[in-house]
Structures are given as structure tokens and as C-alpha cells.
């Protein structure tokens, strides 16, 4: 039930850009601003961002969206945040200056640390406590790397001078002038340091990784007032005092924004990576199929969990065609090329540029194109790139249905690549279930806005969000089932060529 009229500013801090979207109380977009920023690749398999650029671009987007909206400060009820998860920032709590670049979720530099933790037998404990697997994807080993490799960092951390946060924590700390060092449960659950059943940091894991617990943010629910916008933020002077009151990691926010509020409902986000989540309700299911368990959100004392599988490179593989190979000028051209040929010509592309995520969890896999002949052309490669995204999502859904012990009847989709009707149709063909694309594709930002709106009185309960979702198009399977199976069988052969490629 709508309690009051009001507008919510959603900050959507992603892997390649910072965005700000203002929503009204009916879920309509009032204004939007976006600022892309530079990716940093210091070494093969390493990925970084400049934390100050993350902050500055996010504040610029927020300021521009507010200016475009034509609203007054009194119209804004609150601010919600959603963010790229796992990306790790360590900063000086007195100066606010980062001690090193943000180590991005895609970064593989800590694979040797993970290998050692696995060899030490820590895997079962990590899974029991955190719901995760030991992998360089998660924040814990990234923090350890910074403390071990930045001169003086460990000593400063032990003296209580340094703070850690994922991007949500970094933004909230800066928006509130350093008054709130917090992180919501959904983000905490992606660090490999968090006890997801007791909703607290795990002392044993922090000790094993050598991470002082004084660095860690206070774990908090996803919907509550964390603080207010501080004075003096450039371009945001008029928003001083507005409550910052909702936060969730991007995939958790998208699950809510897609109205997957009933156990068994699932969504997939097609962004830089692909992220498939299934609501498991109040039960934190431990996967036997290579998936992980995370907190989805916590509202009014009720915590909701999700099963999750992650594909590390999805939309980024289309960017690779554009930026590194020069085969396309825009993402839409990939669709046009893919549709210009009747099939993939036997070409399969495995986009394991930074390893393979769920369900294989192969940190040493690398990208591969197989099946090339003299007749292969750029259209076949473009088609293979899009099809490769769909195959990986199928692998996730197959694993998820084993863990959930029930079939998925429909998959809700969002994210930038979901605008590709070719990809959505091929996904339906591979999964053999309908694909439901919503009218509002900004589901991640809306999930964050909804959490903020719950805290500041725009909406009353999580059930209210169900009234706001509308479908744009339903894609139903069209391909012959036997043909679909043959395509996927060939894909499995291609993945086998890429696995363990860089392992010495």
C-alpha cells in the first residue's frame, strides 16, 4: 500500500559506470544520469578501479539526475544504493583517502591465496558459515592482498587507522561525511567473511585471513536510515539532510526489483556478467551443484536468502568484440550480425577472460573460440558470443534446479543485454521455459529505491512491489528440443577446451 507520495533517488554504481535514477512512488522513472569510467588492467587477469573516480562519478550522476528532474529537495524522501558487489576498497578513516585502487570482483590476482586456503582444508568451513566457495571473486582474499602488498597497510590496519568496505560502504561513508561505516547484509554476505545465518562477521575467518575486525563495517539491514547526506558535497548542497536509507548489492536489488518475492521465483541479470538468483525464502540452502548462497535482503526483521550462480563475462564479451577486436561499433550491431547468418557455423566462444564462475569455479580457465573454418566470418563470431552467454545461463539454471529440487517455470530477465531479442529468444530455446522481460528494465536501481522507500514511508511492505511490475514481452521456446540439446552438447565440448588453460 502506498503510504505517501515521494520521490526516491537510486544510486546504481556498476562495474563500468555510475548511474543515478529518480523514481516516483509508482515506480516510474523521472530522470536518469550516467557517467562511464575507466577500467584499469595492471596485469593479465587483474582488474581495478580508482575509488575516487567511483565516488566522483556517482556524485556527478546524482547531481545531474536531480537537476534534470525539476524537483525540489523537499520532494525527495530518501536515497537508496545498489552496487557492484565484492569490489574491495580500503581507506584511511581519518583522511578518507584509499590506500590502493579498488580491486574489482572480476580480478583474479588472489587465486594463489585461494589455492592455499583450499589446500589448508578451509573450504567446508567457508561453505558452512558463509554459503560461498573459496574463490578470488569474493572480497576476503582481496583485503588480505592489500594488507600484504601495500607498504605499511597491515600495520596501519592493526592500529585501527584503516577501514574496509565494498562500494556500498564506501558511498555511504562519503555521503554521510564519515559518520556511517556500515554495509547491508546482502553485501556483507559476498565477502567470504560473513556468517549468513547469524548475520555477523566470522572471527575465525578473519583470523585465518589476517584481517583485523576493526576494519569491517557494521552489518545492517537493507532498509533503514543509515544517516543523512552531509554538507559540502559538490553539486549536492541542496540535498543536505536527505536520509540514506536503503542498500543492497546489485543482484539482490534486481531480485527484489523483478518482484521475485516468493520462494522458487528466479531472475537473471545480463550485465557485465550474468547473475542468476532464486529466492529461497527464510532458508539458506547450501548448494551441492556449485552455486552459492547469499542474503538477498533483510527488511523489518525478516531475512530472505537466495541461491546464486555467476557468469563472470557476459556483456563484457560484447564489449570485447567492440573495443579489442573492432568487429562491431555498438552492442546493437552484435545483434544485427548474429541475425545475418542462419546459425553459428559451428563456432563456439567461451568468454572465460577472467576464469569461469558457477557452476565450474575455474580460476584458471581462459577465453577460447573453437570450431573456426575458412568460411567462418565475423557474423559467426558475433552470434557465438551471444549464444555463449545463453549457454552459461543454462548451466546455472540446470544446477539451480538440482539444488532447489524443483523446476523453474519462467525466468525473469533484466540488465543491458536483455534488450537483445535475439539473445532472449535463444535463451528461451536453451532453457525450454518462457523468458519474461519487464517494461521497466532498470530493476536493479528500482530494487534499491524500493528498499529506501520502505524505510522512509513511501511504501508499507515488500508485497507492495508486486503491484508495480509489468511485462514487456514473453519469449517462448521455438527451437526443436533435439537441436537445442545438440547445440548445448557442443558448447560443453568447447568449455572443456578452455578449462584450466592458464594453470601451470
Where are these regions (language model features)?
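N-terminal glycine/serine-rich phosphate-binding loop of ATP-dependent small-molecule kinases
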Residues: 1-100, 128, 234-246, 431-435, ...
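Active-site core segments that coordinate phosphate-bearing ligands/cofactors
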Residues: 9-11, 25, 111, 117-183, ...
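Active-site donor-binding loop signature of nucleotide-sugar glycosyltransferases
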Residues: 35-37, 221, 297, 477
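Short beta-strand-loop/turn "lid" adjacent to the catalytic site in phosphate-handling enzymes
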Residues: 67-104, 133-139, 172-195, 220, ...
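Structured loop/turn residues at beta-strand edges in well-structured enzyme cores
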Residues: 71-74, 214, 406
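Carbohydrate-associated surface elements
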Residues: 107
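A structural motif corresponding to the C-terminal end of an alpha-helix
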Residues: 208-215
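Accessory "access/gating" subregions that flank catalytic or transport cores
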Residues: 218-221, 242-244
Amino acid at each position: 500500500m502506498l503510504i505517501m507520495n515521494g520521490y526516491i533517488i537510486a544510486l546504481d554504481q556498476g562495474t563500468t559506470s555510475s548511474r543515478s535514477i529518480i523514481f516516483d512512488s509508482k515506480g516510474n522513472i523521472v530522470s536518469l544520469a550516467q557517467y562511464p569510467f575507466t577500467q584499469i588492467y595492471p596485469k593479465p587477469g587483474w582488474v581495478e578501479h580508482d575509488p575516487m573516480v567511483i565516488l566522483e562519478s556517482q556524485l556527478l550522476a546524482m547531481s545531474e539526475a536531480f537537476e534534470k528532474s525539476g524537483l525540489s529537495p523537499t520532494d525527495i524522501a530518501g536515497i537508496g544504493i545498489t552496487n557492484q558487489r565484492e569490489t574491495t576498497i580500503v581507506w584511511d578513516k581519518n583522511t578518507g583517502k584509499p590506500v590502493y585502487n579498488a580491486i574489482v570482483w572480476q580480478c583474479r590476482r588472489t587465486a594463489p591465496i585461494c589455492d592455499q586456503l583450499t589446500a589448508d582444508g578451509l573450504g567446508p568451513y567457508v561453505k558452512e558459515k558463509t554459503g560461498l566457495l573459496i574463490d578470488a571473486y569474493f572480497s576476503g582474499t582481496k583485503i588480505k592482498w592489500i594488507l600484504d602488498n601495500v607498504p605499511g597497510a597491515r600495520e596501519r590496519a592493526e592500529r585501527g587507522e584503516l577501514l574496509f568496505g565494498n562500494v556500498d560502504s564506501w558511498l555511504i561513508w562519503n555521503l554521510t561525511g564519515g559518520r556511517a561505516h556500515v554495509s547491508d547484509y546482502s553485501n556483507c554476505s559476498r565477502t567470504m567473511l560473513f556468517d549468513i545465518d547469524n548475520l555477523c562477521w566470522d572471527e575465525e575467518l578473519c583470523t585465518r585471513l589476517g584481517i583485523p575486525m576493526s576494519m569491517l563495517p557494521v552489518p545492517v539491514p537493507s532498509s533503514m536510515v543509515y544517516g543523512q547526506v552531509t554538507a559540502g558535497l559538490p553539486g549536492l548542497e541542496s540535498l543536505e539532510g536527505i536520509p540514506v536509507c536503503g542498500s543492497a548489492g546489485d543482484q539482490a536489488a534486481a531480485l527484489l526489483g523483478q518482484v521475485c518475492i516468493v520462494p522458487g521465483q528466479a531472475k537473471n541479470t545480463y550485465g557485465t556478467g550474468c547473475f542468476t538468483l532464486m529466492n529461497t525464502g527464510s532458508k539458506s540452502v547450501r548448494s551441492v551443484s556449485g552455486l552459492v548462497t547469499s542474503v538477498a535482503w533483510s527488511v523489518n526483521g525478516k531475512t530472505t536468502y537466495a541461491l546464486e550462480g555467476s557468469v563472470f563475462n557476459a556483456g563484457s564479451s560484447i564489449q570485447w568484440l567492440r573495443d579489442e577486436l573492432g568487429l562491431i561499433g555498438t552492442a546493437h550491431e552484435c545483434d544485427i550480425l548474429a541475425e545475418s547468418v542462419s546459425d553459428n557455423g559451428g563456432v563456439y566462444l567461451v568468454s572465460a577472460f577472467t576464469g569461469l564462475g558457477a557452476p565450474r569455479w575455474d580460476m584458471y580457465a581462459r577465453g577460447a573460440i573453437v570450431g573456426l573454418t575458412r568460411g567462418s566470418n565475423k557474423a559467426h563470431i558475433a552470434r557465438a558470443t551471444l549464444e555463449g552467454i545463453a549457454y552459461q545461463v543454462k548451466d546455472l539454471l540446470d544446477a539451480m534446479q538440482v539444488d532447489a529440487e524443483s523446476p523453474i517455470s519462467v525466468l525473469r530477465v533484466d540488465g543491458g543485454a536483455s534488450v537483445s531479442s535475439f539473445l532472449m529468444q535463444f535463451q528461451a530455446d536453451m532453457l525450454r521455459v518462457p523468458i519474461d522481460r519487464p517494461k521497466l528494465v532498470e530493476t536493479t536501481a528500482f530494487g534499491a529505491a524500493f528498499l529506501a522507500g520502505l524505510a522512509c514511508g513511501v511504501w508499507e511492505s515488500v508485497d507492495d512491489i508486486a503491484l508495480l511490475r509489468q511485462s514487456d514481452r514473453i519469449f517462448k521456446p521455438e527451437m526443436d528440443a533435439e537441436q537445442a540439446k545438440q547445440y548445448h552438447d557442443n558448447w560443453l565440448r568447447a568449455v572443456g577446451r578452455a578449462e584450466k588453460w592458464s594453470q601451470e
